[in-house]
Amino acid sequence: MDQFECINVADAHQKLQEKEAVLVDIRDPQSFAMGHAVQAFHLTNDTLGAFMRDNDFDTPVMVMCYHGNSSKGAAQYLLQQGYDVVYSIDGGFEVWQRQFPAEVAYGA
C-alpha cells in the first residue's frame, strides 16, 4: 500500500473487533485522558519507538485523531516508516464516542 486509506468509524470498529488491525490515537495527552477508544494505543513522539517494537510492519494500523484530519498526516508518516497497511479514521474520536459510547475508556 503506497497510500493510506480513509475508513469510517463503523469499519474501524469492525476491524478492531475482528482483530484485523490495531488502533492508535494521536490526540494530545489531556484529550486522550478525557476519553479514548477502549483498545487504543496512545501514539506520541515518546511512544512511537515502543509501538514500532511491539507491532510488525505487516500489522494493519488505524489512526484516530479528533475529527479525522490530523490522522491523515500520521497515517502517511507510518507508511513512510514501513507499515504496509495504514488507515485514517474519518470523523475521528468525535464520531467514535457518539457511535460507540460504551467503548470509551477514561484516564491515561
Curated annotation (Swiss-Prot):
It is found in: Cytoplasm. InterPro entries: GlpE_sulfurtransferase (IPR050229), Rhodanese-like_dom (IPR001763), Rhodanese-like_dom_sf (IPR036873), Thiosulf_sulfurTrfase (IPR023695). SUPFAM superfamilies: Rhodanese/Cell cycle control phosphatase (SSF52821). The active site is at residue 65. GO terms for biological process: glycerol metabolic process. Disulfide bonds: none annotated. Keywords: Cytoplasm, Transferase. One of its GO terms (molecular function) is thiosulfate-cyanide sulfurtransferase activity. PROSITE patterns: RHODANESE_3. Residues 17-105 form the Rhodanese domain. GO terms for cellular component: cytoplasm. It is an enzyme of class 2 (transferase). Pfam families: Rhodanese (PF00581). It comes from the Bacteria. It catalyses: thiosulfate + hydrogen cyanide = thiocyanate + sulfite + 2 H(+); thiosulfate + [thioredoxin]-dithiol = [thioredoxin]-disulfide + hydrogen sulfide + sulfite + 2 H(+). Its EC number is 2.8.1.1. Belongs to the GlpE family. PANTHER family: FAD-DEPENDENT OXIDOREDUCTASE (PTHR43031), THIOSULFATE SULFURTRANSFERASE GLPE (PTHR43031:SF6). Transferase that catalyzes the transfer of sulfur from thiosulfate to thiophilic acceptors such as cyanide or dithiols. May function in a CysM-independent thiosulfate assimilation pathway by catalyzing the conversion of thiosulfate to sulfite, which can then be used for L-cysteine biosynthesis. This is Thiosulfate sulfurtransferase GlpE. It comes from Escherichia coli (strain ATCC 8739 / DSM 1576 / NBRC 3972 / NCIMB 8545 / WDCM 00012 / Crooks).
